[in-house]
Amino acid sequence: MFDDLKGKRVLITGSTQGIGLAAVEAFARAGAKVAMNGRRTPADLEATLARLNGLGGEVVFLPADVSDSAECGKLVESFVERFGGIDVLVNNAGGLVGRKPLPEIDDDFFDAVTDLNSRSALMVTKHALPHLKAAAAQNGTTSSVILVGSVAGYTGGGPGAGLYGAAKAWLHNIQKNWVAFHTKDGIRFNMVSPGTFDTAFHADKDEDTKARIGSGFPMGRFGRPEECAPTFLFFASHACSGYITGQVLDVNGGQYMP
C-alpha cells in the first residue's frame, strides 16, 4: 500500500522513543531514508540503529534540541547534507514539560512548554520549506508535512496541563494558515492527533491507574505506539493522500470525537 515511500527522505523530530520511534520503524519498513532525532543520544543508539537498519530502509540519528531555533536550522541542514533533500517532515517533538496550574505558571515555564511544542514545529518547518518545495517539483508529486497534535488540543488538557493543551491547539490552528499559503508549492500539511498512549508521557502512572483511566475510553485501554504509526505513512504517501491537505486524523480509541 505504501510502495511509493521507498527511498523517500523522511525527517522525524523527537523520535527516539514512543510514537516517534514507532513512526521511524514504520517508515524504515516501507524502505524510506529516515532521520531519527532527539536532544540526547540514546544509550542504546548503536543497537537501535542496527535493528532499524535491518528493516529495509536507511536510518540515521541526528541530534538536535529543536526547542532551540538555531538548532532547528542546523538539523535541517544536516539532514539535507546527508540525503540531498526532504520529502516528508514529521514534527513529532513535544512533551508536557511539567504540570503547573495557572497560579504557578511563570515566564520560564511558559517558554519551555511553547518552545518545545509550538516553536519547534514552526522553525523546523520554516527551514525545511524550500527543500520540500524543491522535492515536490522534482518528483512531480507532493511533499508532506505532518504535525502531531493531541486530544489536549481539543479539550484544553488535564490538571496542570493547560499550557500543553494550548500549545497543541496552536498547532491545530497554524496548520490552516500553512495550507492556505503553501499548498500551491506542492506541499501537503496534515496532522495526526493522538489520544492517550502508553508511552513515557504517562510514566508517572502505575498500571492500575492506567487501566482505570483507559477503561473510561470506548476502546477500554491506552493506545500502543505502533497503532499510531501507520497514520504517518498514510499522510506521507502521495498515492494514498495526494489530494488530502489541512486535515486532522484523530487516533484516540474514541476518547474524544470532534
What are these regions (language model features)?
Residues 16-17:
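Conserved glycine-rich cofactor-binding loop
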Residues 30-47:
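Conserved glycine-rich Rossmann-like NAD(P)H-binding loop of the short-chain dehydrogenase/reductase
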Residues 85, 183, 188, 240-245:
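Short, small/polar-rich loop/turn modules that mediate ligand/substrate recognition or access, typified
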Residues 94, 133, 137-170, 175-184, ...:
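Catalytic loop of short-chain dehydrogenase/reductase
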Residues 103-123, 146, 171:
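Catalytic Tyr-X3-Lys loop
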Residues 221-251, 256:
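C-terminal substrate-recognition "lid" of short-chain dehydrogenase/reductases
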